[in-house]
Amino acid sequence: MTDYQNDDDGFVSKSQRKRDMDALQDLGRELVDLSKDTLKKMQLPEDLLTAVLDYKRFTANGALRRQMQYIGKLMRDVDPEPIREYLKVLKGESSEHIAWQHLLERWREKLMADDKALSDFLAAFPEGDPQQLRTLMRNARKELQDNKPPKAYRQLFQEIKALIPEPGKPRLWQKDEDEE
């Protein structure tokens, strides 16, 4: 009589492999929807980047289907998690990104409410330009008072955004910016 052992540790069913490959193709579909500049910022492997850009050139349905399968095949050699994280950040879905945006909004509200908040902000972020921030605060308050479009209010937000770095932004396969 044969003694069968349960060797589940290395076994993946054919159905599971197909589901995994479909998930990689779906991730590839998300990549082909991105702009060329965004794709280049991601620093994808050269063959995958070329395949995604080629997909955008094709118009025949059969060619698009084959190219998407090829993209799925190339995705097998790439760790998909950094790509998924980057796409989440682009969509603004990551909890860290949302918390960062809320932090920016809180600082803007503090600065709009009280002039003394500027010294607190500059203590936390000393690279800020106090004169520029003070001018934006004054102009934003005046716009709010005169019921004008919030141009300076938005500029103040952009200035704060430039000073407070976004936490956990995935770097994927990027080289150090000092080396470029």
Curated annotation (Swiss-Prot):
Gene Ontology CC: cytosol
Tree of life domain: Bacteria
InterPro entries for this protein: DarP (IPR006839), DarP_sf (IPR023153)
Transmembrane segments: none
GO molecular function annotations of the record: ribosome binding; rRNA binding
Keyword Repeat among record annotations: no
UniProt-annotated location(s): Cytoplasm
Gene3D superfamilies: PSPTO4464-like domains
Gene Ontology biological process terms in this record: assembly of large subunit precursor of preribosome
Primary localisation category: cytoplasm
Key words, A-Z: Cytoplasm, Ribosome biogenesis, RNA-binding, rRNA-binding
Family: Belongs to the DarP family.
UniProt cross-references to NCBIfam families, sorted A to Z: PRK05255.1-1
Function, as annotated: Member of a network of 50S ribosomal subunit biogenesis factors which assembles along the 30S-50S interface, preventing incorrect 23S rRNA structures from forming. Promotes peptidyl transferase center (PTC) maturation.
Protein name: Dual-action ribosomal maturation protein DarP
Classification lineage: Bacteria, Pseudomonadati, Pseudomonadota, Betaproteobacteria, Neisseriales
Gene: darP
